[in-house]
Regions:
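Acidic, low-complexity/disordered tracts enriched in E/D and polar residues
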Residues: 345-407, 426, 430-439
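N-terminal FAD cofactor-binding segment of flavoenzymes
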Residues: 33-69
Length: 439
C-alpha cells in the first residue's frame, strides 16, 4: 500500500489522516507542538464540521460556551453563543484520536523536505528520516513552497492587504467566560476570557499604515491600546495582568498559487488562509481538508483521472478562498465611520466587487460536466451550475439534479417529481423554490 506522509497535526492534517485511514492507507503524521497556547472562538457550525470530520472526541475537554458581544459601526449588540476552544487541550485530543485510528505519530520539528517524482524524504529533528510516496502539507500559512522541480506552471496565487495580528495572553482573576469583538479607527480587536482567568486580546492592523514600534516596545504598545478602549477596560474589569505574553503573526489572506500535484497536496491554511474576520480558521481548514482523502485516493489509484482530481481540489480551494474573502470584505464595508482610513479603505474593496452570495435565477441554471466525489474517488458527472454554486451541484437528498432538471424542462413538475419518494419530493421542491423556480 502507498505510504503517505502528512506534515502538521492541526484540524486539517488530522482530518486528512483520519479520512485516509478509513480508506485503508498507512499514514505517518509529523508535527511539532504549537509554541503559543492559543484560544479560538468557534460557532456551532464549526463544531458540527469537526464532528463530521470524526474529531468530536478532541473537543471533549477543550470547549467553554461564551456570550459574544460585538461593537461595530457605532452599534453594540450581543450575538449568539460562541464556544471558546482551548487549542492545547484540543491539539492533545487530536493526537489521541489519530493514535486510536492507527496513524503513526512522530513528534518533532521538520528540518527539511526533499521531493522528487519518486517520492519524498523528510528530515525531523531528533528522529529518523521519513520516506513516503505521497506528501500532504498541512503546516498552516507559514508552510514553505514545494521544490521548484515539482511545481506545474505558475498558478495564480492571491494575497490580500498585508495584515498583522498582535495577540496578548495573561492571567487575570477567575470569573465567567466571555468574548467580544470591536472595531477601531486603524483596525479591530477580539478579546476573550476563560472561567479560569486566562485572558486573551488580539489587535489586527494594516502592516503598511500601522507604524508599530520595535519588538521590545510591542507589549507596552498593546497594553496602552487596551487601556485606551473603554470596552476592553470594562471587559477585563481593569484586572491585574500577570504573566503577560505577546505573539505576533501575519494574518494576511493568502491563496497558494498551486495546491495539488501528482504526488503532493496542500490543505488547510497551507492551501489558503483568509482574514480572521472572514470566518473561523478551523472551518476554512476543514473545508479543503475533507475532500483531500478522495483526491489523494484518485491520484494514487486512478492515474488516468489525475488531471480531474487536481482540477477538483484546485477549483474548490480557490472558490472557498474567494467566497470567504468576499464575506470578509462585506464585514469591513459595514464599518462606515472610518471608510477613508487606510485599514478600512484597502479591505472594503478587496478582492473585487462581486457579491458574496449571488442572487437566485432559475433561468440561469445550466448543466455541465464537472468533477465530483463518488465512492471515495474523484469522478466526472453532469452537475447543475447555479449563480451561487459555479462549481455545480451533483445531487440533493440522493437525487441527481441534472436528470431532474432535464425532466422538469421537458415534462413539467408533476411528472418530473413523480419518481421521487415523499421525503425526496419535499426536499427537492424546497430546493427548486430556493433557486427561484415558480410552478
Amino acid at each position: 500500500m502507498h505510504a503517505i506522509l502528512i506534515l502538521g497535526a492541526g484540524p486539517a492534517g488530522a482530518a486528512v489522516a483520519l479520512g485516509l485511514r478509513r480508506l485503508g492507507y498507512p499514514v505517518t503524521l509529523i508535527s511539532d507542538w504549537r509554541r503559543f497556547p492559543a484560544l479560538e472562538g468557534v460557532s456551532v457550525r464549526v463544531l458540527e464540521a469537526l464532528r463530521g470530520a470524526g474529531l468530536e472526541q478532541a473537543l471533549a475537554q477543550a470547549l467553554q460556551p461564551s456570550q459574544r458581544r460585538v461593537a461595530w459601526n457605532g452599534e453594540e449588540h450581543a450575538q449568539n453563543i460562541e464556544y471558546l476552544l482551548d487549542r492545547p487541550a484540543f491539539d492533545r485530543g487530536l493526537r489521541q484520536a489519530l493514535r486510536e485510528a492507527g496513524v503513526q505519530l512522530i513528534e518533532g520539528r521538520v528540518l527539511g523536505v526533499q521531493s522528487t517524482e519518486a517520492g519524498h524524504r523528510v528530515q525531523v529533528q531528533g528522529q529518523a528520516e521519513q520516506v513516503g510516496e505521497f506528501l500532504v502539507e498541512a503546516r498552516g500559512r507559514q508552510a514553505p513552497v514545494l521544490d521548484k522541480g515539482l511545481r506545474q506552471g505558475a498558478g495564480k496565487g492571491l494575497r490580500g492587504p498585508e495584515t498583522v495580528s498582535l495577540l496578548n495572553r495573561w492571567q487575570g482573576p477567575v470569573g465567567s467566560a466571555a468574548s467580544a469583538v470591536y472595531s477601531l479607527e486603524d483596525g479591530w480587536a477580539w478579546m476573550a476570557r476563560r472561567a479560569d482567568g486566562q485572558c486573551y486580546w488580539q489587535l489586527t492592523l494594516d502592516v503598511a499604515s500601522a507604524g508599530l514600534p520595535g519588538k521590545v516596545q510591542l507589549l507596552e504598545y498593546c497594553r496602552q491600546r487596551r487601556q485606551a478602549s473603554a470596552m476592553a477596560r470594562e471587559f477585563f474589569a481593569d484586572g491585574e495582568e500577570q504573566q503577560l505574553h505577546l505573539h505576533a503573526r501575519s494574518s494576511t489572506a493568502i491563496l497558494n498559487p498551486q495546491v495539488c500535484g501528482a504526488h503532493w497536496l496542500r490543505v488547510g491554511d497551507a492551501a489558503m488562509a483568509v482574514d480572521p474576520l472572514s470566518g473561523n480558521g478551523i472551518f476554512q481548514s476543514l473545508s479543503s481538508a475533507l475532500q483531500a482523502p478522495a483526491v489523494i485516493n484518485t491520484l494514487l489509484q486512478r492515474p488516468q483521472n489525475r488531471a480531474l482530481a487536481q482540477r477538483f481540489h484546485g477549483q474548490r480551494v480557490e472558490h472557498l478562498f474567494q467566497r470567504f474573502a468576499r464575506i470578509g470584505r462585506d464585514f469591513y464595508a459595514d464599518e462606515q465611520r472610518w471608510s477613508e482610513q487606510p485599514f478600512w479603505q484597502a479591505r472594503r474593496h478587496w478582492p473585487d466587487q462581486q457579491q458574496a452570495h449571488a442572487s437566485v435565477d432559475f433561468a440561469a441554471l445550466r448543466i455541465e460536466r464537472a468533477p465530483v466525489l463518488r465512492d471515495g474517488l474523484v469522478d466526472e458527472a453532469d452537475v447543475v451550475v447555479t449563480p451561487d454554486q459555479p462549481l455545480g451541484i451533483w445531487h440533493v437528498q440522493g437525487v441527481e439534479l441534472a436528470p431532474l432538471l432535464r425532466r422538469l424542462r421537458s415534462q413539467g413538475a408533476a411528472q418530473a417529481l413523480a419518481p421521487l419518494s415523499p421525503e425526496q419530493g419535499r426536499v427537492i421542491r424546497g430546493w427548486l423554490l430556493s433557486q427561484g423556480y415558480r410552478p
